[in-house]
Amino acid sequence: MTNLTIALDAMGGDFGPRITVPACLRALASNPHLKILLVGQPDSISPLLANQNAELISRLHVIPAEHIVANDAKPSHAIRASKGTSMRVALDLVKTGEAQACVSAGNTGVLMGLAKLRLKAIDGIERPALVSVLPNQKKSKTVVLDLGANVNCDSQMLVQFAVMGAVMAEEIAGIHSPKVALLNIGEEESKGLDNIREAATVLKATPNINYIGYVEGNELLTGKTDVLVCDGFAGNVSLKTMEGVIRVFLSLIKSSTGDNKKTSWWMKLLKKWLQKRLNKRFGHMNPDQYNGASLLGLRGIVIKSHGGANENAFTAAIEQAVQAIERQIPERIASRLNTVLPKSD
């Protein structure tokens, strides 16, 4: 297998190197052909690499970057002042071909802006979108976009997202003729904002898109649609609400055995059995397992991790980058877009 190289913004996210460095080591252990360029402040990174496996360390190289993009930074200002930041250095490593993908848990708006400036968008795409492939009730996958890269979207952008999402579902999730829907407050054609209704009109008339209409938020995980399209505001709120509910549910399962000394032995045994069955049935819904959203529509691979990701979740984001490299996502998406999406003037 060909060697893979990922540039990683070690300083991004709520916890920085405390999470990113251990996650890197785990990803290296799982992928013997992987090399990671760890971008950030050496003084913060090096102590976390002490006494680690020598073979893993040989495939991990620290690239100095003294500055950090603050989580609360205003994108316009942070982009202008981005030179020397770990986020920009990591993206530039992809631009120059020294790395094949970039992973960051940093400021979403800044990452979006910098990625578009440094890597450029695929021809015909107005703005890249954050997309994630989520598990659904039918034990299949649902591609959801945009998840926060573009708060306001006109109808043309929603149409482009629909096309990209359909390509993603077909090429990556292996779904033939994927069903595409727009997120809305009802299924009736008259409902929704103007941009949503205008996008629906265009999608209905697009022969290469299997458009099925509107889907409400309560059907996000039912598998009713293979691709769910929305603006970044609605998508981000929907995703985080869904993840919060799932985490509460899984925590209730985890605590179901309890430590009550008055509980009979057979009741404790029953609870443990039930917990095991529920974990087996619903464990795949754990948000940590699908952390990482791809900035779809760029000429390079960029994976955005949740800022508050733990070690397991950040490792999942790195693994997603590995898969994206192996499957040559930008090239395959660009190839399909040439036949599906009309090029803009």
UniProtKB/Swiss-Prot annotation:
Subcellular location: Cytoplasm
GO biological process, one term: fatty acid biosynthetic process
UniProt main location, coarse: cytoplasm
Keywords carried by this UniProt record: Cytoplasm, Lipid biosynthesis, Lipid metabolism, Phospholipid biosynthesis, Phospholipid metabolism, Transferase
GO cellular component, one term: cytoplasm
Source species, domain of life: Bacteria
InterPro entries tied to this protein: FA_synthesis, Phospholipid_synth_PlsX-like
HAMAP family noted in UniProt: PlsX (MF_00019)
Family the UniProt entry places it in: Belongs to the PlsX family.
Function: Catalyzes the reversible formation of acyl-phosphate (acyl-PO(4)) from acyl-[acyl-carrier-protein] (acyl-ACP). This enzyme utilizes acyl-ACP as fatty acyl donor, but not acyl-CoA.
Subunit (UniProt): Homodimer. Probably interacts with PlsY.
Name this polypeptide is given: Phosphate acyltransferase
